[in-house]
Amino acid sequence: MSKSTLQDGAIYDAKTLGAGRVVVLGFQHMFAMFGSTVLVPALTGLSVSATLLFAGLGTLLFHLLSKRKVPAFLGSSFAFLAGYFALAPNGERELLPYACFGVALAGLVYLLLAGLIKLFGANRVMKFFPPIVTGPIIIAIGLCLSATAINSCSTNWIVAIVAILIIIVCNIWGKGMIKIIPILLGVVGAYVLCIILTATPASSLVDLNAALAGTEGYVPNMVHCIGGNANFQLFTQASIDNIKNAAWIGLPFQYNDTVFSIFTNGKADSGLLITAVATIVPISLATIVEHIGDISAISSTVGSNFIKDPGLHRTLMGDGLATTLASLFGAPANTTYGENTGVLTLSKVFDPMVVRLAAVFAIVFSFSPKLAACISAIPTPVVGGISLVLYGMISAVGVRNVVENKIDFGKARNVIIAAIILVLSIGIAYSAAGAIVIPINASITISLSGLAVGSLVGIILNAVLPGKDYVFEEDAKDAPAKKDGKKK
């Protein structure tokens, strides 16, 4: 592989890079998804190791069902958080399997839609998703995630900026392999900086929960900070202790955490089962819309029509089965990950084999609590700096989608659709509630994210407003031929 190919061209056959470089690229994809993937179990009380195991297995299953053509990684979905909180508000271990039961059924909704698309064709579905809808949705995906990145960066802007600068320098001025692994280098560089700072006298422990000392339920949150300043956080003491205490080998999940345990202990609560279904299954309608947006983003990034080949029905089937499988064994719902789409955009290595390698790494790490703890210990500002770039890249892909499809913003309908999608998606995401909450009865509510609401309203507006001129061409001309691993 010539240097010019590494620097300028999109790479479709990673084997031409050599085994060593492919391994490094696989690690880059794993590091990119890790922060968000382990955050979901941290918030809900689910197993981190089980999450990694079924993120890896789910990704491999997705690739198998999508004919190994789509370079997507499946990680933990944030869309179902409201469902987990509704069933197990305090992460009660005995209640989480009920929430997982609801999520498992939500995954089956994907399969139902996949069957309908296979039966009636993608045209009838994709006519509701023209570029004027998918473009703003993709833009909104990145912008809705941006607050998480900024909040993480704010724990130590110095470290976050170092991570960002490493990515920029490597991606713009890097040569050869350095240019295509900027995310990995950003993680490693900022991680090493945090290790050095933590080991020096400049760092001291600070209890971020000190204001709650003496109150009921008080738990210290000790964090190593530069100069004892909470605005310059490094490693948490808990993460360091986890590394020290974690075993090298361990099983990723326990039977009592699985959905099967509900029906084998003879104490299944039918009321909780019904609540789980009514609360969580409707969320799948929103996540399906997000799935189509993600696949559109990956298609735009890679330059291939994945809606046509391998087909939307296959990607939905892969996502749905991965979600159901993960949930049955007590892991969070899976979803195609925007972070990894950002990695594709930066590295320009589009070979799905690299993503599958990342999935294998995730599976291996799931059986080693020690290795998982080392990755989980990545300081929050490092994750923030990396995420800031990746989320921005997602939105940039949306902008490119709009530009390349030559959307006419001289038409009032196009302006209205784009405006409503963006304002609803971002506005609701940043509102006090963070979602639209729909009460069903005294004990059941449905929570829709800003992205879900914006997407659904945008789809409806596109369907009812006059002036539609978009025709989805399932047999659109494929991407230019690929040769020697590079698109010509």
Residue ranges and their predicted role:
Residues 85-91, 171, 340-355, 361-365:
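Interfacial segments of multi-pass membrane proteins
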Residues 34-39, 55-62, 79-82, 140-141, ...:
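Hydrophobic, membrane-inserted alpha-helices
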Residues 10-20, 45-63, 279-352, 483-488:
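Membrane-embedded helical hairpins/re-entrant loop segments and their flanking transmembrane helices
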Residues 33, 191-195, 208-323, 327, ...:
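Membrane-embedded hairpin module used as a gating/binding unit in multi-pass transport
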Residues 1-72, 79-93:
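N-terminal signal-anchor module of multipass membrane proteins
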Residues 95-207, 359-475:
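Membrane-embedded alpha-helical modules
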Residues 38-43, 73-86, 293-302, 334-346, ...:
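Re-entrant/interfacial helical elements at transmembrane boundaries that shape
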